[in-house]
Design a protein with these regions (language model features):
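Ubiquitin-like/PB1-type beta-grasp interaction modules and other compact soluble beta-rich domains
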Residues: 2-98
Length: 99
């Protein structure tokens, strides 16, 4: 069985872009059966502060961070275990509160 590989696009919000080399988009190599968690692990390996801003100490998404896979909130899918395929788009949204 041949493994399918390709790229997933990770869209980074403006507030987090300085943590990933000021990039609005990252192209991530994805293997067959990759999960959202594995992709976030790969980004965090290169950009550790980004990883800490998006996930807490237990590895779960922080409350104020949402990740969408092709427009669907991953929390409504299979959370961080949601499978990601080549050609899909992950978008990170960070809530901003102020007053």
């Amino acid at each position: 069985v041949a493994l399918m590989t390709g790229e997933v696009t990770l869209l980074v919000p403006r507030l987090l872009q300085p943590l990933v080399g000021n990039s609005a988009e990252l192209a991530l190599d994805v293997g067959d059966g990759a999960t959202v968690a594995q992709l976030l692990d790969a980004v965090a390996a290169e950009f550790p502060v980004f990883g800490r801003r998006v996930r807490d100490e237990t590895g779960e998404l922080r409350r104020f961070v949402n990740i969408y896979l092709d427009g669907e909130d991953v929390r409504r899918l299979d959370g961080l275990k949601t499978r990601v395929a080549a050609g899909q788009e992950l978008m990170v949204i960070q809530s901003v509160a102020g007053g």
